[in-house]
A protein has these predicted regions:
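Glycine-rich, charge-decorated loop segments at or immediately adjacent to ligand/cofactor-binding or catalytic sites
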Residues: 3-20
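Anaerobic metallocofactor- and corrinoid-dependent redox/one-carbon enzyme cores
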Residues: 7-9, 50-492
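Short, hinge-like loop/turn segments at secondary-structure boundaries
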Residues: 18-21, 47-48, 119-120
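Short acidic-hydrophobic, aromatic-tinged amphipathic segments that line or gate anion-handling sites
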Residues: 27-38
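Short, hydrophobic alpha-helical segments
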Residues: 39-47
């Protein structure tokens, strides 16, 4: 037995609701009183309505007051509505010509009951202790002093690369046979570069045989872009967080075109890697050592004010880096052609600073992981199959889920069907609070990364404040009213 609220003129469709209930076997009454009487009689009980006491009508004269302007407006104009909840309610109101705003809200954890229980537990269990631990994590990030110390062969700072044939890869752990094609292609390129094989066929045979050990970059204080493939003789940036004394490593950016990080392994790719090993790496290493290292924070603060967000756009920071090292390189005792090639490569490679930013983020967030409590995300990465995160209070444990496929611009003739799922350790930049977290700083590239424009960038960065707990005062964004970058992704 039921009643339906409303009238036949209601937008939601009174008659349709009544009809639907009747078709389901429901007795529909016109009002609650009849429904109660019907239900009582349906279970076999008698019901007598009590006699109501009739009282004489009393009247009183009241002083009429003028209605407020807002009240008259409410009665004389169409309503302006903010809808919280199901979007269909807003659509009905809009269909009748009323102004309506759909509030962007969703149930916690997507409505997953079990996850909501977990969230409620986290909020109630030692909440003050968790908040205090999170503040400690953030304090470490803000106080960090990352410095580019050197460029050296990876095997000289990562001991695991000296234990036979070893390849580092991006993301959480994965077996070679499960890697997507671009990552496998990067592994082939590394095998050719290291001289383990002379042909692609030989390289794939070695890689699939079990002879090569695969280790996530994150497990050895390193990060790698896209496929993240790093082998013993590849030069890496050494970034030291001088506040805590820990180091992190990342390969150098190869530029654009056919590159190892995207899975290419042609002679052109291998030759460039050899040049980076023999010329670019040693040259930058000498230059950086000669100036006693290069403080990263001033470069980031300068470049974010010039339109970089340090994941997709790095041109300002790359040129700022070139500005620091080029005077030294021009005075170094070296082959003139090599000198020209190094300067030209740095000038042409807009994304060169990305790898420095990645090593910086890794060094800073690894130091923050020394706080063994809390719920701050300290690493995010992808291997083409899984997306993995680490959390400050959870040690080295990986939490993984199926990885998404990026939405962006495609070359002519290609579409989403041709896309490889997301991969790379470069999301360490977002973990650090830049990259997509600071998209508002780089409106020039919003459409390239799949956003619609400035308003989308503003909305994205504003939304990020909802999942982070603080701002980084070291990196302020002028076109965001000089607010600091978002900081401290809270897993809660």
């Amino acid at each position: 037995v039921a009643t339906v609220c409303g009238t036949r003129r209601d937008f939601q469709g009174y008659d349709k609701a009544v009809e639907t209930l009747k078709e389901a076997g429901v007795i529909v009454c016109e009002n609650n009183k009849l429904a109660v009487h019907t239900a009582i009689r349906a279970i076999g009980l008698d019901f007598e309505e009590p006699v109501k006491e009739i009282r004489p009508k009393t009247t009183a004269r009241i002083q009429k007051t003028d209605a407020s302007e807002k009240l008259l407006e409410l009665l004389s104009q169409k309503p302006r509505v903010i809808n919280v909840g199901l979007k269909s309610f807003a659509e009905v109101i809009e269909a009748f010509g009323c102004d309506v705003v759909q509030y962007d809200w969703a149930p916690p954890a997507g409505g997953n009951v079990e996850l909501i229980k977990v969230l409620n537990f986290l909020r109630s269990c030692r909440e003050m202790d968790i908040d205090e631990a999170n503040r400690s994590v953030i304090a470490k990030v803000v106080a960090s002093q990352p410095v580019i110390k050197d460029v050296v062969p990876a095997k000289s700072v990562i001991k695991e690369l000296n234990e036979g044939k070893v390849i580092l890869h991006a993301g959480p752990p994965i077996r070679f046979e499960n890697m997507p094609d671009p990552v496998q292609g990067s592994c082939v390129g590394a095998a050719l570069f290291e001289g383990w094989a002379a042909t692609e066929e030989e390289a794939r045979k070695i890689l699939a045989s079990g002879e090569v050990t695969f280790i996530p970059c994150h497990h050895v204080k390193a990060v790698g872009p896209m496929g993240g493939i790093t082998s013993a003789n590849m030069p890496v940036f050494v970034v030291e967080n001088q506040t805590d004394g820990n180091e992190a490593y990342c390969t150098m950016n190869e530029g654009i075109g056919k590159v190892l990080r995207f899975g290419a392994y042609s002679k052109e790719v291998v030759d460039r890697l050899l040049w980076m090993k023999d010329v670019l790496g040693p040259t930058l290493g000498r230059a950086i050592r000669s100036i006693g290292g290069l403080n990263v924070n001033p470069l980031v603060a300068k470049a974010i004010a010039m339109g970089d967000e340090f994941h997709q756009r790095n041109i300002a920071a790359s040129l700022a880096f070139l500005k620091e090292v080029s005077p030294v390189i021009t005075k170094m005792d070296m082959d003139e052609k090599d000198r020209y090639d190094v300067i030209k490569f740095l000038a042409d490679t807009d994304q060169f600073f990305l790898n420095i930013m990645m090593a910086t983020g890794k060094a800073v967030m690894d130091a923050a992981r020394q706080v063994t409590d809390g719920t701050i995300v300290t690493a995010m990465c992808r291997n083409g199959v899984e997306f993995g995160i680490r959390i400050s209070g959870m040690g080295d444990e990986w939490f993984t889920a199926p990885v998404n496929t990026p939405q962006g611009l495609y070359f002519t003739g290609y579409d989403g069907e041709d896309v490889c799922p997301d991969m790379g350790d470069s999301a360490i930049t977002e973990t650090f609070g830049v990259g997509g977290m600071a998209m508002i700083a780089a409106p020039a590239v919003t459409r390239f990364v799949g956003a619609g424009g400035y308003e989308d960038a503003l909305r994205t960065s504003t939304e990020m404040t909802e999942i982070t707990i603080d701002r980084n005062p070291n990196f302020i964004i002028p076109n965001w009213n000089f607010q600091g970058t978002c900081l401290g992704i809270d897993a809660r």
